């Protein structure tokens, strides 16, 4: 059995990691680490685990990391890198769910997140977008799990970028996310009365995920590009729906476009291409799937891509487990074949 330690286990992503790992036939959770809930049983903080998991949250201790084969760091950016360094020095497989190890360009990271204490480790890390960077993930020491918005956007755009089917500076990404994307920490802006029956844009022209999306899209396209990204907050708990627009470099009809996407993602279980309808949040909620729908606007020669994910699963915990499966040479689907709840 693979022994897994989760650092930052009491947040939304940490709890989702625990829930999913309990279903994994090859994993034993060896420790759950949370300074805010230290010495408290998870049965008390999260009663849904009663009779299922009898573990107590612990404060960080290097001995807990030593016991593990894989370490998941579900901590905020800037904080996470300290724990990643400890696990890396111990030779553990490290999967970091913050932004600290997603970038290759230190300048991009520093502009949005500040100084990086261990920039040399960026060369030891891979970007954990499994369907695109699988080979790099296999050989890296650290996996930087992608952000939720970037996962939806990049996978929606990848076939267009790799095949140079769109003008590089024509991309507009309009994304809507559930409130869980903001994390568990109390914030008035995300309280019930502020969010319920409301819908708003935020981080307009300055959201930090823009640089992450641009770096990876530039890599796929083969040259630097700029794009527009605007996130919005939906009055729902979870899920991301991205509507992506770009101008074609040549005319394509919808059937041709669908075939390009189906061929590009031919061997990817977690990518579902819609042919006769469009994705909706309820079809991906609770799953590790990415649902992609396509339309062609002939009068403007633009492609419209709809890309849907569950922000806590494919956008975080599920993709982290998919990365773990890759690192340990397991079938990527292991523990992640889940039908969405729908209602």
UniProtKB/Swiss-Prot annotation:
This protein's record includes keyword Amino-acid biosynthesis: yes
KW Signal (keyword) present: no
GO BP of this protein: L-arginine biosynthetic process
Compartments where located: Cytoplasm
Enzyme Commission number: 1.2.1.38
Keywords of the record: Amino-acid biosynthesis, Arginine biosynthesis, Cytoplasm, NADP, Oxidoreductase
Enzymatic reactions: N-acetyl-L-glutamate 5-semialdehyde + phosphate + NADP(+) = N-acetyl-L-glutamyl 5-phosphate + NADPH + H(+)
Pfam families, per the entry: Semialdhyde_dh, Semialdhyde_dhC_1
Active site: 148
GO molecular function: N-acetyl-gamma-glutamyl-phosphate reductase activity; NAD binding; NADP+ binding
Gene3D superfamilies: Dihydrodipicolinate Reductase, domain 2, NAD(P)-binding Rossmann-like Domain
Annotated GO CC locations: cytoplasm
Chief subcellular location: cytoplasm
Pathway of action: Amino-acid biosynthesis; L-arginine biosynthesis; N(2)-acetyl-L-ornithine from L-glutamate: step 3/4
Function: Catalyzes the NADPH-dependent reduction of N-acetyl-5-glutamyl phosphate to yield N-acetyl-L-glutamate 5-semialdehyde.
Record HAMAP family: ArgC_type1 (MF_00150)
Family designation: Belongs to the NAGSA dehydrogenase family. Type 1 subfamily.
Protein name: N-acetyl-gamma-glutamyl-phosphate reductase
Species in which this protein is naturally found: Caldicellulosiruptor saccharolyticus (strain ATCC 43494 / DSM 8903 / Tp8T 6331)
The encoding gene: argC
């Amino acid at each position: 059995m693979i022994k897994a330690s989760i650092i930052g286990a009491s947040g939304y992503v940490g709890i989702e990691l625990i829930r999913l790992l309990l279903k994994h036939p090859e994993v034993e959770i060896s420790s759950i680490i949370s300074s805010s809930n230290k010495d408290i049983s998870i049965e008390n903080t999260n009663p849904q685990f009663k009779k299922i998991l009898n573990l107590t949250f612990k404060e960080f201790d290097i001995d807990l990391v030593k016991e593990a084969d894989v370490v998941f760091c579900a901590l905020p950016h800037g904080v996470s890198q300290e724990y990643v360094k400890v696990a890396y020095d111990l030779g553990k497989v490290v999967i970091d769910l913050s932004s600290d190890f997603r970038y290759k360009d230190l300048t991009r990271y520093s502009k949005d997140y500040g100084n990086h204490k261990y920039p040399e480790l960026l060369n030891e890390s891979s970007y954990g977008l499994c369907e695109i960077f699988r080979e790099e993930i296999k050989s890296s020491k650290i996996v930087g799990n992608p952000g939720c918005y970037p996962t939806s956007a990049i996978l929606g755009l990848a076939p267009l970028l790799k095949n140079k089917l769109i003008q590089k500076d024509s991309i507009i990404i309009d994304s809507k996310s559930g409130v869980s994307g903001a994390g568990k920490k109390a914030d008035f802006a995300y309280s019930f009365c502020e969010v319920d029956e409301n819908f708003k844009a935020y981080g307009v022209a300055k959201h930090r995920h823009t640089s992450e999306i641009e770096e990876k899209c530039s890599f796929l396209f083969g040259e630097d590009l700029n794009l527009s990204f605007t996130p919005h907050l939906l009055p729902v708990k979870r899920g991301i729906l991205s509507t992506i627009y770009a101008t074609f470099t040549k005319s394509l009809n919808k059937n041709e476009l669908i075939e390009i996407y189906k061929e590009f993602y031919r061997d990817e279980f977690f990518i579902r291409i819609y042919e006769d309808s469009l994705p909706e949040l309820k079809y991906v909620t609770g799953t590790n799937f990415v649902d992609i729908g396509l339309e062609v606007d002939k009068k403007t020669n633009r492609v419209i891509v709809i890309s849907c994910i569950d922000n806590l699963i494919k956008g975080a915990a599920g993709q982290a487990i998919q990365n773990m499966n890759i690192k340990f040479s397991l079938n990527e689907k292991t523990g992640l074949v889940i039908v969405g709840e729908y209602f």
